[in-house]
């Protein structure tokens, strides 16, 4: 899977990139392949060219080796072209993310290989134009190294050794991966915040891209939290998307951007992952709809799987002293935003919002586990903070 670092991020309170668009069946979505698989296929194509083998428009390449699995699975990957370049060759693959909202979809991945006959069975991996380099701790790649994750590295090594062995070649190979538009693409990802500079990352735990993968989102949330903790931060500020994060940043102006993580709908996972990494204090910023769902105790808040319980919200409003006519209107509202508009003029509005926020806080601290305090910040779409607890 690719990481969320290469995905579009949710704007808040809508249908973000964690779920397919309305009317699209997840099972019918087309899978793609990762940047790691693109790099590997390019390397295989280039090696074949160097060894004098014929060009194949589709190559069967190994997927990343998995623990406990002896022989990796394989995938057919289209190859755009192979070019002789210097004393080696370059294989070109156009990244295909399938139906996933992936910033790297359509990117030209160029993998240059050069044989090193005097370097016995050595694979040297380098990053060229458009491939990032790691500058912050907490990532699975060491500081100073090219941003190619362990999965793609193992995938590349397996494939290179496979081709070389078939040709009876026991020397070394230098592999340089390039993404000509990588630096521009990276501006639409979270790489800058993660301290990956100069381009995109080469990613892929499985080698294939599952559209709107929850696992990819969770892996990226965990990665961002790991970077923040490795930098020594004790507070993490989690939000549901871009707008709530921007408002949360204004609320905590002394914290660097690495302390802020967009968790989308994965509230329980994100809070638990933050607690596991040793954060002492957490903040959660959201708008009213996500707040109500958290107050309901829902661990995942996307509309497709987590319905808003407006009759329950109405009951909470009644308990807070909201006028009965407004309570009934809240129960029959179409959206959380409409319910908030109904409550706002009432004298008991602030009491009601405080009560809902306290319920959300209780569930957030349950998700985080004992000993971790969570502060909830409720924002209005106009940018004001309505309450906190």
From Swiss-Prot:
Its EC number is 2.1.1.195. InterPro entries: CbiD, CbiD_sf. It comes from Nitratidesulfovibrio vulgaris (strain ATCC 29579 / DSM 644 / CCUG 34227 / NCIMB 8303 / VKM B-1760 / Hildenborough) (Desulfovibrio vulgaris). It is an enzyme of class 2 (transferase). This is Cobalt-precorrin-5B C(1)-methyltransferase. It comes from the Bacteria. Keywords: Cobalamin biosynthesis, Methyltransferase, S-adenosyl-L-methionine, Transferase. Pathway: Cofactor biosynthesis; adenosylcobalamin biosynthesis; cob(II)yrinate a,c-diamide from sirohydrochlorin (anaerobic route): step 6/10. Gene3D superfamilies: CbiD-like (3.30.2110.10). Belongs to the CbiD family. Pfam families: CbiD (PF01888). GO terms for molecular function: cobalt-precorrin-5B C1-methyltransferase activity. One of its GO terms (biological process) is anaerobic cobalamin biosynthetic process. Coiled coil: none annotated. The keyword Transferase applies. The keyword S-adenosyl-L-methionine applies. It catalyses: Co-precorrin-5B + S-adenosyl-L-methionine = Co-precorrin-6A + S-adenosyl-L-homocysteine. Residues 1-25 are annotated as: Disordered.
């Amino acid at each position: 899977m690719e990481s969320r670092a290469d995905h579009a991020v949710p704007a808040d309170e809508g249908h973000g990139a964690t779920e397919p668009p309305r009317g699209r069946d997840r099972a019918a979505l087309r899978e793609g392949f990762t940047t790691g698989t693109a790099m590997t296929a390019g390397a295989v194509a280039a090696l074949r060219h160097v060894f004098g083998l014929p060009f194949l428009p589709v190559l069967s390449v190994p997927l990343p080796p998995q623990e406990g699995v002896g022989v990796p699975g394989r995938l057919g990957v289209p190859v755009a072209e192979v070019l002789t370049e210097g004393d080696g060759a370059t294989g070109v693959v156009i990244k295909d993310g399938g139906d996933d909202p992936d910033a790297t979809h359509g990117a030209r991945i160029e993998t240059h290989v050069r044989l090193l006959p005097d370097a016995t069975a050595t694979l040297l991996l380098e990053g060229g134009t458009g491939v990032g380099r790691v500058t912050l701790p907490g990532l699975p790649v060491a500081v100073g190294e090219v941003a190619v994750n362990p999965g793609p590295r193992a995938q590349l090594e397996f494939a290179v050794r496979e081709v070389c062995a078939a040709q009876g070649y026991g020397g070394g190979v230098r592999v340089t991966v390039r993404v000509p538009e990588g630096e521009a693409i990276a501006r639409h990802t979270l790489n800058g915040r993660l301290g990956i500079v100069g381009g995109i990352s080469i990613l892929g735990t499985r080698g294939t891209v599952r559209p709107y993968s929850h696992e990819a989102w969770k892996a990226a949330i965990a990665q961002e939290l790991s970077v923040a903790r490795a930098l020594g931060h004790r507070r993490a500020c989690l939000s549901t998307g871009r707008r709530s994060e921007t408002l949360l940043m204004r609320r905590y102006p002394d914290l660097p951007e690495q302390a802020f993580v967009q968790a989308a709908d994965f509230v329980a996972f994100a809070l638990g992952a933050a607690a596991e990494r040793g954060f002492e204090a957490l903040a959660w910023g959201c708008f009213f709809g996500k707040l109500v769902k958290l107050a309901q105790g829902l661990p995942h808040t996307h509309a497709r799987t987590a319905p808003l319980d407006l009759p329950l919200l109405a009951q909470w409003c009644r308990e807070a002293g909201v006028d009965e006519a407004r309570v009934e209107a809240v129960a029959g509202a179409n959206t959380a935003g409409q319910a908030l508009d109904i409550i706002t003029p009432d004298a008991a509005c602030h009491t009601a919002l405080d009560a809902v926020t306290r319920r959300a806080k209780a569930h957030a601290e349950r998700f985080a586990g004992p000993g971790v305090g969570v502060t909830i910040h409720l924002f209005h779409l106009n940018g004001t903070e309505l309450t906190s607890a």
